[in-house]
C-alpha cells in the first residue's frame, strides 16, 4: 500500500484549509514586501518592534565578529559560550528566579520541560486551547494525559482529584489564537492545593505584560512557588530567536540532565545571544513601547466594535476577529490584501471547526495612522463580505 498524499492534499484544498507560505522579501516590520507586493502587515509577533532595532542589529554584528556565526556543538560538549551564560543570568533576573536555561526554539523548550518532568505513572493536565507544542509534549511524555475546559479552574480541580504520580498542570499564559489570559491565580491555587506543579508557557506575555515586561506572572504578582516552571520565547517581543525555561536551581539542573531536546542539539549562535541581551535591555528600559502598544490596542478595539466586528476577550496585542466559516475568513483576508493590508486567516485545525478568524496582531512599531488604515479597510471589506453569498 502506498501513501496517498495527493488525496490528502486535495481534501485540504476542498475544505479551504490548504496552507501556503508567503514569501517575505523585506525586513520584518509593519511595512513589508510579500510575494512582490508592498503591504501594511498586521500579522507578525515582533510585539515591541525590536527585530530591526539598530542597537540589536549592531549587537549581533559585534557578537558575530567576536564569536563567529555558529554554536559549534551542544551545550554539554563545548557549545555553551559566554554570551549564552550571560543571557541565562539576565533572563533569570528578569523573571526573579535563581536560574534560566536557553533552548533553541519554544517548541523544544516546551517538549524538553514536560518530558523531563513527567513520564509513565505520572499525570499531565492541560488547557484545551494550549499551543500545539504543549499538547505534543504531553502526549509524548508517556504520562497520563488529559485536558481541562478552557481557563476553567473547577474543571482542572476535578481532574486533579483523579491524578496519579507527579502531576504537572500546563497552560499558555496568553492564548495565541484567542489573545485571552490564563486565570493564573485560580489555576495556581488549585494546583498547589493538590501538591501539583504549574507550568506556564508565556510566549506572548513577555514584553507586552507586566510593569517591566516580565509577562503574565509579573502581571498577576505571582511567585515561583505559584508557577514553578516558567517558559518564554525570544522570537516574539524580544525580536530575536530561541526560548528559555526559568525556575529553581533544582529544576534547571534537572533539565540539563534529562531534557533531551536540550541535550541533543547544537546551541544557538552566540551572536544571537548577544543580540538578545541588547533587546532584553531595551525591553526592560523603554517602557514607552508597552504604553504605545496599549494605546494601539484600545484604538483598534474601539474602532472594531463601532464597525460591528466580533472581537474576543483580549487586551493583548493578539486581536482575533471571529468570522466562523473558513472560506469567508480566507475571502476577507484576500479582500484586505487587495487593499494593501495583510491580516492572516486562521482556520481549522489550528482553531476549532466553525471558529475561523482573522488574527490581527499589533506591535509597538505600528502607528495610530496605520491602525486607522486597517480599521477603514476592515469596515469596507466586511460590508462587502456581508453582501456576498455565504458560499463565496
Curated annotation (Swiss-Prot):
Q: Which UniProt keywords apply?
A: Biotin biosynthesis, Pyridoxal phosphate, Transferase
Catalysed reactions listed for this entry: 6-carboxyhexanoyl-[ACP] + L-alanine + H(+) = (8S)-8-amino-7-oxononanoate + holo-[ACP] + CO2
User: Which parts of the sequence carry N6-(pyridoxal phosphate)lysine?
Assistant: 236
**In the UniProt record, does the keyword Transferase occur?**
yes
Q: Key word Transferase present in the record? A: yes
For activity, the cofactor(s) needed are:
pyridoxal 5'-phosphate
Q: Name one GO molecular function term.
A: pyridoxal phosphate binding
> Which residues of this UniProt protein bind substrate?
19, 131, 350
An example of a Gene Ontology BP annotation on this entry? biotin biosynthetic process
Per its UniProt record, what Pfam families does this chain match?
Answer: Aminotran_1_2 (PF00155)
**Can you tell which superkingdom this protein's organism belongs to?**
Bacteria
On assembly, the entry states:
Homodimer.
Instruction: Note the NCBIfam families from the entry.
Output: bioF (TIGR00858)
Record protein name field:
8-amino-7-oxononanoate synthase
Point out the gene that encodes the protein. Answer: bioF
Amino acid at each position: 500500500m502506498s501513501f496517498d498524499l495527493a488525496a490528502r492534499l486535495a481534501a485540504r484544498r476542498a475544505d479551504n484549509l490548504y496552507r501556503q507560505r508567503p514569501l517575505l522579501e523585506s525586513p520584518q516590520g509593519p511595512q513589508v514586501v510579500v510575494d512582490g507586493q508592498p503591504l501594511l502587515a498586521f500579522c507578525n509577533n515582533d510585539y515591541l518592534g525590536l527585530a530591526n532595532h539598530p542597537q540589536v542589529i549592531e549587537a549581533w554584528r559585534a557578537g558575530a565578529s567576536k564569536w563567529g556565526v555558529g554554536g559549534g556543538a551542544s551545550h554539554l560538549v563545548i557549545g555553551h559560550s559566554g554570551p549564552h551564560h550571560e543571557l541565562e543570568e539576565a533572563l533569570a533576573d528578569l523573571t526573579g528566579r535563581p536560574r534560566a536555561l536557553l533552548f533553541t526554539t519554544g517548541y523544544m523548550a516546551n517538549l524538553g520541560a514536560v518530558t523531563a518532568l513527567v513520564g509513565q505513572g505520572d499525570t499531565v493536565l492541560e488547557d484545551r486551547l494550549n499551543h500545539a507544542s504543549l499538547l505534543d509534549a504531553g502526549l509524548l511524555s508517556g504520562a497520563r494525559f488529559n485536558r481541562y475546559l478552557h481557563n476553567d479552574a473547577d474543571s482542572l480541580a476535578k481532574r486533579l482529584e483523579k491524578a496519579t504520580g507527579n502531576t504537572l498542570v500546563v497552560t499558555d499564559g496568553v492564548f495565541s489564537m484567542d489573545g485571552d489570559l490564563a486565570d493564573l491565580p485560580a489555576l495556581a491555587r488549585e494546583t498547589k492545593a493538590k501538591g501539583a506543579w504549574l507550568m506556564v508557557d508565556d510566549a506572548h506575555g513577555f514584553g507586552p505584560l507586566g510593569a517591566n515586561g516580565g509577562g503574565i506572572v509579573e502581571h498577576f504578582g505571582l511567585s515561583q512557588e505559584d508557577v514553578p516552571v516558567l517558559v518564554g520565547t525570544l522570537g516574539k517581543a524580544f525580536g530575536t530567536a530561541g526560548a528559555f525555561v526559568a525556575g529553581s536551581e533544582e529544576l534547571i539542573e534537572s533539565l540539563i540532565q534529562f531534557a533531551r531536546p536540550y541535550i541533543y542539539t547544537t546551541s544557538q549562535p552566540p551572536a544571537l545571544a548577544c543580540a538578545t541581551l541588547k533587546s532584553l535591555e531595551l525591553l526592560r528600559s523603554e517602557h514607552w513601547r508597552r504604553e504605545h502598544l496599549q494605546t494601539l490596542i484600545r484604538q483598534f478595539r474601539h474602532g472594531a466594535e463601532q464597525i460591528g466586528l466580533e472581537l474576543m476577550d483580549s487586551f493583548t496585542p493578539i486581536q482575533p476577529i471571529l468570522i466562523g466559516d473558513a472560506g469567508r475568513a480566507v475571502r476577507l483576508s484576500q479582500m484586505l490584501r487587495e487593499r494593501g493590508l495583510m491580516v492572516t486567516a486562521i482556520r481549522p485545525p489550528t482553531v476549532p471547526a466553525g471558529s475561523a478568524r482573522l488574527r490581527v496582531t499589533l506591535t509597538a512599531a505600528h502607528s495610530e495612522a496605520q491602525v486607522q488604515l486597517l480599521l477603514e479597510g476592515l469596515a469596507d471589506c466586511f460590508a462587502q463580505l456581508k453582501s456576498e453569498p455565504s458560499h463565496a
